[in-house]
Amino acid sequence: MLELRFIRENLDLVQERCNRRGMSDELITSFTEIDQKRLSTLAEVESLKNKRNVASKEIAELKRGTDEQKLEAEPLILEMRQIGDKIKILDTSLNQIQEDLDKVVMAIPNLCQDDVPVGNSDEENIELRVWGKKPEFTFTPKAHYELGEEADTIDFERAAKISGARFAILKGFASRLDRALTNFMLDLHTQKHGYTEVLPPFLVNSASLTATGQLPKFKEDLFAIKDWDLYLIPTAEVPVTNIHRDETIAEQDLPIKYTAFTPCFRSEAGSHGRDTRGLVRQHQFNKVELVKFTTPERSTDELESLLGDAEEVLQLLGLHYRVVKLCTGDLGFSSSKTYDIEVWLPGQQKYREISSCSNFLDFQARRGGIRYRPEGQKKSKLVHTLNGSGLAVGRTLLAVMENYQQEDGSITIPEVLKPYFENRF
C-alpha cells in the first residue's frame, strides 16, 4: 500500500496515476472526504481533552479551598463528566472513521512507473523484443489438447468427473514432461541463477494475502477453507514473500532470491467462457516462482535480471517468444511495472503469456512490514520486492508439445530435457 502521508501530500499525483489505470476519481475523492472527517474529529477530541485537563487542574484547586470554593467545583465536575462521555463517543466514531480510511488506502493500487505505457487493455501493451523464430511445419500443427487427447496423455473428461471443469489429468509422457520441466527450471535457477529453493505451505492466512495484495480486493479469485482463516495459494508469491513479513533484514544479506515450485489454485472468477479447452486456464496448475527482496537502489536492475532468468528457460528449450511491457490498464494491482513473456503456440496460432515479471517497489513491503537495516544506520527502511514466473509449468508443457510435435502426433524432447528422461531403474 501507499503511505498515508504520501497520499495526503500528493493527492494530484495519486489521482493521476489511478486515472492512468482507467480508474475514476471516486476512490481518491472518498479518501479525501474520510481523511478530512478524521482530522476534524481528531481535532475536536484533542480540544475536548485539553479542556478537560485544564478543568481538572481547576477542580483540584477548588477542592483544596474553602467550602464555598468546593461548591463551585460541582458544576465543573458535572461538565467534565459530560465532556468525558462525548470523548468516548467521538473515540468510537474515530475508530470507525480510521477503519473506513484504512479500507480506502488498501484499495489504492501501486503507482505505475513513469515509463509504463498508458493504455486500457492488453492490446496496448508494447512489444519490446522477440527471440527465436516461429517453427515451420509441413503439416497443420495441432493444439496441445488435441495432441494430448489423441495420445491419451491428457484426460480432461475424467478430471471433470472427479473435480469439475478446468481440471486435467496428465498421464504417461505428459506427466513425465511436467516433472522434467519442473526439475529443469529449479536446477537452472538454483545452480546457475543463484536462487535458494524453498518449499512453502500451500495454505496461507489472510494476513499473508493482504501483505502481497490479493486481499481484500481479489477475494473472489481465491479458494477459501471454510471455518478456517486459510486459503489455497493462488501463486507461490504469497507464501514466499511472507517468509520475511514483519522482519528486518540486514543490508548485507540483500538481495535475497528465492525460487519455489508449488501448485497454484485460482477460481478464475470473471473468466467464464474464456479458454475453456486445454491447459491455458485451469483452477489448479503448477508453477515455478522467482521472488526477490532488495534495496530501493537495486530494484530496477533486479527486475531486468529477473526477466533474463525467466527468458533463459525458454531460450534453453528453444521456444520462440516475445517480451512485452504491460500498459497501465493491464498492470496488476500491486505492481509498479511488469514485463510479460509470451510464448508462441503454433497449434493455436497465437502468443500466450507464460511469465509475468514485476517490480512492486515498497508497496508489498509496507503492507507486510518487511524492512532492512542499512549498514551503519539505526533506522530501518522498507525493502523492495519483485517476483516473476520462472515459468508456469503447465503452459511451458503445452508450448513444448505444440512446438515440438511431429506429424504422427509424437513429441520430440528438447535437448536440454533429455537428461531428465533417462531411465534410472
Swiss-Prot record:
Source superkingdom: Bacteria
KW Mitochondrion (keyword) present: no
Keywords (A to Z) from UniProt: Aminoacyl-tRNA synthetase, ATP-binding, Cytoplasm, Ligase, Nucleotide-binding, Protein biosynthesis
PROSITE patterns for the chain: AA_TRNA_LIGASE_II (PS50862)
List of residues binding L-serine: 235-237, 289, 389
InterPro entries assigned to the protein according to its UniProt record, in alphabetical order: aa-tRNA-synt_IIb, aa-tRNA-synth_II, aa-tRNA-synth_II/BPL/LPL, Ser-tRNA-ligase_type_1, Ser-tRNA-synth_1_N, SerRS_1_N_sf, SerRS_core, tRNA-bd_arm
Functional pathway: Aminoacyl-tRNA biosynthesis; selenocysteinyl-tRNA(Sec) biosynthesis; L-seryl-tRNA(Sec) from L-serine and tRNA(Sec): step 1/1
Pfam families: Seryl_tRNA_N (PF02403), tRNA-synt_2b (PF00587)
Positions annotated to bind ATP: 266-268, 353-356
CDD domains found in the cross-reference section: SerRS_core
Keyword Signal: no
Cellular compartments annotated: Cytoplasm
Entry's Gene Ontology BP terms: selenocysteine biosynthetic process; seryl-tRNA aminoacylation
Family, per entry: Belongs to the class-II aminoacyl-tRNA synthetase family. Type-1 seryl-tRNA synthetase subfamily.
Purpose: Catalyzes the attachment of serine to tRNA(Ser). Is also able to aminoacylate tRNA(Sec) with serine, to form the misacylated tRNA L-seryl-tRNA(Sec), which will be further converted into selenocysteinyl-tRNA(Sec).
Entry-linked HAMAP family: Ser_tRNA_synth_type1
Subunit comment: Homodimer. The tRNA molecule binds across the dimer.
Written domain comment of the UniProt record: Consists of two distinct domains, a catalytic core and a N-terminal extension that is involved in tRNA binding.
Protein name: Serine--tRNA ligase
Gene that produces this protein: serS
